[in-house]
């Protein structure tokens, strides 16, 4: 009796964890997209104000975007590990 109840609870928890992993991966990707969009918009605005500093602004923009993508990739990998394990 107790074993069947525990098995049913475990099966339900697996479904919830997979749902949580999928939501987490989606939120990580959405957050990264919004962050990179904000960086791009701000960089274009800064380049429009000071065209002579475009090289430095572009370099900083690429570094910040790469860091955001790295964090997003790590979050997606963790969510995939939760999903499949």
Curated annotation (Swiss-Prot):
Q: Where is this site: Reversibly protonated during proton transport?
A: 69
Question: Which Gene Ontology molecular-function terms are recorded?
Answer: lipid binding; proton-transporting ATP synthase activity, rotational mechanism
| One of the protein's GO biological processes | proton motive force-driven ATP synthesis
Keyword Ion transport on entry:
yes
Q: Mind telling me which InterPro entries this protein's record contains?
A: ATP_synth_csu_bac/chlpt (IPR005953), ATP_synth_F0_csu (IPR000454), ATP_synth_F0_csu_DDCD_BS (IPR020537), ATP_synth_F0_csu_sf (IPR038662), ATPase_proteolipid_c-like_dom (IPR002379), F/V-ATP_Csub_sf (IPR035921)
SUPFAM superfamilies, alphabetized:
F1F0 ATP synthase subunit C
A Pfam cross-reference name:
ATP-synt_C
GO CC, alphabetical? plasma membrane; proton-transporting ATP synthase complex; proton-transporting two-sector ATPase complex, proton-transporting domain
Q: Which UniProt keywords apply?
A: ATP synthesis, Cell inner membrane, Cell membrane, CF(0), Hydrogen ion transport, Ion transport, Lipid-binding, Membrane, Transmembrane, Transmembrane helix, Transport
Q: Does the keyword Ligase apply?
A: no
**PROSITE patterns from the xrefs?**
ATPASE_C
What the entry lists under Gene3D superfamilies is as follows:
F1F0 ATP synthase subunit C
Membrane topology qualifier? Multi-pass membrane protein
- Membrane spanning stretches: 22-39, 65-85
Q: Which domain of life is it from?
A: Bacteria
Question: Main localisation, per the record?
Answer: membrane
Q: Where in the cell is it found?
A: Cell inner membrane
Family to which this protein belongs: Belongs to the ATPase C chain family.
What is the purpose of this protein? F(1)F(0) ATP synthase produces ATP from ADP in the presence of a proton or sodium gradient. F-type ATPases consist of two structural domains, F(1) containing the extramembraneous catalytic core and F(0) containing the membrane proton channel, linked together by a central stalk and a peripheral stalk. During catalysis, ATP synthesis in the catalytic domain of F(1) is coupled via a rotary mechanism of the central stalk subunits to proton translocation.
Q: Which NCBIfam families match?
A: ATP_synt_c
Quaternary state and interactors: F-type ATPases have 2 components, F(1) - the catalytic core - and F(0) - the membrane proton channel. F(1) has five subunits: alpha(3), beta(3), gamma(1), delta(1), epsilon(1). F(0) has three main subunits: a(1), b(2) and c(10-14). The alpha and beta chains form an alternating ring which encloses part of the gamma chain. F(1) is attached to F(0) by a central stalk formed by the gamma and epsilon chains, while a peripheral stalk is formed by the delta and b chains.
Q: What is this protein called?
A: ATP synthase subunit c
**Organism annotation:** Bacteroides thetaiotaomicron (strain ATCC 29148 / DSM 2079 / JCM 5827 / CCUG 10774 / NCTC 10582 / VPI-5482 / E50)
Q: What is the lineage of its organism?
A: Bacteria, Pseudomonadati, Bacteroidota, Bacteroidia, Bacteroidales
